[in-house]
């Protein structure tokens, strides 16, 4: 009776709080601004004029483009037609009011009273069939769970089980409707109020991407909002929300799902049975596993010996089945005018880079690796095996390769504006980089890293992210390049140890320099250095004799003088936004690896000015040993990957 009364009172309180939490709307404006009455605004408004009608007539989702303007609209499945129209038009009105002249905008409109939810996004880059985790809106309930706080452990277990069931319902949905990735479940918990949970993804992405998007939202809620009475997180690719009351009218015809039954075996008995079974299994399994590991070790040792003795026939090596991307050497000679000096656009640690033109007129960039360079062979193979399997607008595209005789050549898309370092560290060219342009470059690099770490079919650690390895296309969009030092991780692998440190000192994380361990957080550190360079307009090399840029920025932050490091050419009217980016950069370059954020979390922070972010702790290499480590690093520059491009 006491439990029933508590549940009734809690449910009543929740219903009273709906008026506080029922209307949920959030908008985010990012990127550069466009002039009033510009062609961009006219094209955007033209798409807006028909968007609500297009969404409803196309089954609840619509993606449209017009001369560089891209618009996406999504409504909840089983939507009411007029409700969807009203929701989309309200989102458009909010964007025009709050993000009137911003190139990129995102509005998530959720109104319980109108029984509808929708999202609208505008951008200058196509996002069709691309998983987009940011920008994101976060809307937790303002009310904390305290009525049954003593049972929070049990509640969390049942809540997690419900998340798993909803995820499964969403990602294996075989619906023939446009809005195929959708799930709304009601779960009746034995000791708590009913829980209502809804998940939805845009239908243009695949089920794996849908699952990753929703898992990211669940993880964020669990890490940042746990203890709140419900809430929602809205991303361009997915929506997640749960409450103690029905919302959107999404649960009228939903089958109730009972909570999984609790174990009937007493805990002590269950443990003893488990231990007994485990002991029996171990007796038989352990010897088998040991013998298997020994056998695998012998096979691997034999393979290494055989390779070192016989060598590798590069002419017959198909590079992971990518032989179809093989270029004829004579074609490359013609394209580059026999590697003429006039076509040379850069010189790297392992070869030269040339501009070329294919017979069809397509411009290409050709990297000709230095003959006899052992490290160059590793770089060559790495790039072929990795880049041919990666596709993202913020990664440089590998068109093909050539390995005839002693030649090892990589052919890339041509990126006309060279690399970032030729702009940000040049006194004159730096003036061209407005804050909006710098912010867009930073966000683009972050998206490229999220793809490498989380969203591609592989998990890749770049290990050599720096300004000279970020190329800029004709529209100054960034493309991460040079994957010669990259390492492939298993999806469940978190860290690795290398025998030799490779990379560029100043961008390498402390744990990598000191202990030779690396992980996704190693790339996060490098990203933080690049971000701080973008804000200051100065290379980390300029700080070598003193502290290093991360440590210098940290000391200024602690002293309350962080604004002093901002590039003087940037507008002071944007100082609040720039200070937030400095804050994020310092979080990325923290000495403590575990405190550095993931790149997906960085994307969320960059895309929203309302999400609270933690205070940074001490930056890497802040202690007195920095100078000694720098001197040790300069002794091994021959082992580092250093590529410098010069425009012609």
UniProtKB/Swiss-Prot annotation:
Protein name as catalogued: Cysteine-rich receptor-like protein kinase 38
Residues making up the signal peptide according to the UniProt record: 1-25
Organism for this UniProt entry: Arabidopsis thaliana
Annotated binding of ATP, by residue: 345-353, 367
Keywords: ATP-binding, Glycoprotein, Kinase, Membrane, Nucleotide-binding, Phosphoprotein, Receptor, Repeat, Serine/threonine-protein kinase, Signal, Transferase, Transmembrane, Transmembrane helix
Active site: 464 (proton acceptor)
Extracellular side: 26-278
Domain of life according to the entry: Eukaryota
Reaction equations catalysed: L-seryl-[protein] + ATP = O-phospho-L-seryl-[protein] + ADP + H(+); L-threonyl-[protein] + ATP = O-phospho-L-threonyl-[protein] + ADP + H(+)
Domain Protein kinase: from-to ranges: 339-611
Modified residues (Phosphothreonine): 504
Topological domains annotated Cytoplasmic: 300-648
Enzyme class, spelled out: transferase
């Amino acid at each position: 009776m006491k439990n029933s009364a508590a549940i009734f009172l809690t449910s009543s309180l929740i219903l009273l709080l709906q008026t506080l939490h029922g209307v949920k709307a959030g908008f985010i404006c990012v990127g550069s601004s466009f002039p009033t009455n510009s062609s961009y605004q006219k094209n955007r408004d033209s798409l807006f004029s028909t968007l609500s009608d297009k969404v409803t007539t196309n089954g609840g989702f619509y993606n449209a483009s017009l001369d560089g303007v891209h618009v996406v609209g999504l409504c909840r499945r089983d939507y009411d037609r007029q409700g969807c129209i009203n929701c989309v038009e309200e989102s458009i009105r909010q964007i025009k009011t709050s993000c009137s002249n911003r190139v990129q905008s995102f509005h998530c409109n959720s109104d319980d009273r109108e029984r509808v939810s929708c999202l609208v996004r505008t951008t200058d880059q196509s996002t069709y069939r691309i998983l987009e985790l940011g920008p994101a809106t976060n809307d937790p309930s303002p009310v904390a769970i305290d009525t049954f706080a003593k049972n929070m452990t049990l509640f969390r277990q049942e809540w997690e089980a419900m998340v798993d069931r909803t995820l499964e319902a969403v990602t294996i949905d075989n619906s023939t409707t446009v809005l195929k990735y959708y799930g709304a479940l009601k779960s009746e918990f034995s000791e708590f109020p009913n829980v209502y949970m809804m998940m939805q993804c845009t239908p243009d992405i695949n089920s794996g991407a849908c699952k990753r998007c929703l898992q990211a939202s669940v993880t964020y809620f669990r890490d940042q909002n746990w203890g709140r009475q419900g809430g929602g997180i809205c991303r361009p690719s997915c929506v997640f929300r749960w409450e103690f009351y029905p919302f959107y009218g999404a649960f009228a015809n939903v089958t109730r799902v009972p909570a999984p039954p609790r174990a009937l075996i007493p805990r002590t008995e269950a443990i003893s049975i488990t231990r007994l079974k485990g002991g029996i299994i171990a007796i038989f399994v352990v010897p088998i596993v040991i013998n298997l590991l020994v056998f695998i070790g012998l096979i691997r040792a034999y393979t290494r010996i055989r390779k070192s003795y016989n060598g590798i026939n590069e002419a017959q090596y198909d590079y992971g089945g990518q032989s179809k991307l093989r270029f004829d050497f004579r074609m490359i000679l013609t394209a580059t005018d026999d590697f003429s000096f006039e076509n040379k656009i850069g010189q790297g640690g392992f070869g030269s880079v040339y501009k070329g033109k294919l017979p069809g007129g397509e411009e290409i960039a050709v990297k000709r690796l230095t003959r006899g360079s052992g490290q160059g062979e590793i770089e060559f193979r790495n790039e072929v095996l990795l880049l041919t399997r990666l596709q993202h607008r913020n990664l440089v595209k590998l068109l093909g390769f050539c390995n005839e005789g002693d030649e090892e050549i990589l052919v890339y898309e041509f990126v006309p504006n060279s690399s970032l370092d030729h702009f940000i560290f040049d006194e004159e060219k730096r003036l061209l980089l407005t804050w909006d342009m710098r912010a867009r470059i930073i966000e683009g690099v972050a998206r490229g890293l999220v793809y490498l770490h989380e969203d591609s079919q592989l998990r890749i650690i770049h290990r050599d992210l720096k300004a000279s390895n970020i190329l800029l296309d004709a529209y100054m969009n960034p493309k991460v390049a040079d994957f010669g030092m990259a390492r492939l991780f298993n999806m469940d692998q978190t860290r690795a140890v290398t025998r030799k440190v490779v990379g560029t000192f100043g961008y390498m994380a402390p744990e990598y320099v000191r202990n030779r361990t690396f992980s996704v957080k190693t790339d996060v550190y490098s990203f933080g250095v690049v971000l701080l360079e973008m804000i200051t307009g100065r290379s980390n090399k300029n700080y070598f004799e003193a502290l290093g840029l991360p440590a210098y920025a940290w000391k200024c932050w602690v002293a309350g003088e962080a604004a002093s490091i901002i590039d003087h050419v940037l507008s002071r009217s944007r100082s609040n936004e720039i200070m937030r980016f400095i804050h994020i950069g310092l979080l990325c370059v923290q000495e403590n690896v575990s405190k550095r954020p993931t790149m997906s979390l960085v994307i969320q922070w960059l895309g929203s000015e309302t999400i609270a972010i933690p205070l940074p702790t001490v930056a890497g290499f802040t202690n007195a040993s920095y100078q000694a480590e720098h001197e040790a690093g300069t002794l091994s520059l021959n082992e580092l990957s250093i590529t410098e491009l010069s425009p012609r």
